[in-house]
C-alpha cells in the first residue's frame, strides 16, 4: 500500500496504468494544488513508472485537474477519458449489497442459496452466506472455464455444478473469488427485481452525483 501522503493521493485519485519504463507528459495543467505543477506531477509519475493517469483534486469550491499519457500520444488522457476500473466494481457491489441489507431485503448472514433461483439445488452453496461472499471466504474458487462461461452467457448454475468449484467449507479460508462477487450480483438482481446497471445508478451513482460512471 502507498506509504506517503503524495502516493496515497495519487493512488486514490488517479487510475494509473503501470509500465516498466516510461515518463508521463502533462497534457492539461490546471493550477490550484502543488501536485498539479508540472515538475511535481511529472516527478511522481516518473518515480512510479506511470504512463497514463488522470488526477482530480477538489477542496471545497477549488478544483484542479491534470492528466498525462504516453501510451497513445494521438489520444492523450483528458477529463472524459474512460478507464477500465476492473475490480473496483467489487467495491460498488459491496456498497449496494450493504444498502440492500440496510433496507431489509436480506441479511448479512442470509444463506446465498435461499436468495437465488435454484440455489437450494446447488450443494456447492451449502452454508455460504452473503457475508462469506463479501469477504471472499465462501470457499468457492474461480475455475479456468469462468471466462468462457461468461462469454457464452451460461448461467451461474453451470459453474456451481462443477465438482471442483468448492475448494473448502465456507469460513475456513480466504480465497479471492470473482465468481463469488458475480453471485452477489445475481442475488442483487433477484432480490431487487432490477438489472445491475439501473440498480447501481439508483442506489449508488445518482446519490453520489457520479454522472459519468
Q: Which residues make up each language-model segment?
A:
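Short, conserved catalytic-motif segment at the N-terminal edge
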Residues: 32-83, 105, 155, 161-164
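Catalytic nucleophile serine of serine hydrolases
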Residues: 87, 175-178
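Well-ordered alpha-helical segments within folded domains of soluble proteins
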Residues: 93-94, 180-185
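Short, conserved phosphate/pyrophosphate- and ester-handling motifs at nucleotide-, phospho-/glycolipid
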Residues: 90
Amino acid at each position: 500500500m502507498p506509504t506517503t501522503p503524495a502516493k496515497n493521493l495519487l493512488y486514490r485519485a488517479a487510475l494509473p496504468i503501470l509500465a516498466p519504463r516510461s515518463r508521463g507528459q502533462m497534457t492539461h495543467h490546471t493550477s490550484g494544488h502543488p501536485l498539479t505543477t508540472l515538475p511535481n506531477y511529472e516527478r511522481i509519475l516518473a518515480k512510479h513508472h506511470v504512463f497514463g493517469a488522470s488526477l482530480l483534486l477538489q477542496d471545497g469550491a477549488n478544483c484542479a485537474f491534470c492528466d498525462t499519457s504516453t501510451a497513445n500520444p494521438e489520444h492523450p488522457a483528458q477529463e472524459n477519458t474512460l478507464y477500465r476500473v476492473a475490480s473496483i466494481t467489487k467495491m460498488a457491489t459491496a456498497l449496494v449489497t450493504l444498502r440492500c441489507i440496510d433496507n431489509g431485503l436480506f441479511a448479512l448472514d442470509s444463506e446465498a442459496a435461499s436468495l437465488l433461483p435454484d440455489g437450494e439445488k446447488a450443494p456447492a452453496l451449502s452454508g455460504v452466506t452473503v457475508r462469506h461472499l463479501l469477504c471472499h471466504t465462501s470457499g468457492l474458487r474461480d475455475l479456468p472455464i469462468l471466462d468462457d462461461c461468461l462469454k457464452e452467457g451460461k448461467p451461474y448454475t453451470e459453474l456451481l455444478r462443477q465438482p471442483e468449484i468448492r475448494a473448502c467449507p465456507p469460513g475456513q479460508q480466504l480465497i479471492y473469488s470473482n465468481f463469488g462477487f458475480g453471485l452477489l450480483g445475481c442475488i442483487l438482481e433477484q432480490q431487487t427485481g432490477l438489472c445491475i446497471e439501473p440498480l447501481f445508478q439508483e442506489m449508488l451513482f445518482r446519490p453520489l452525483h457520479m454522472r459519468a460512471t
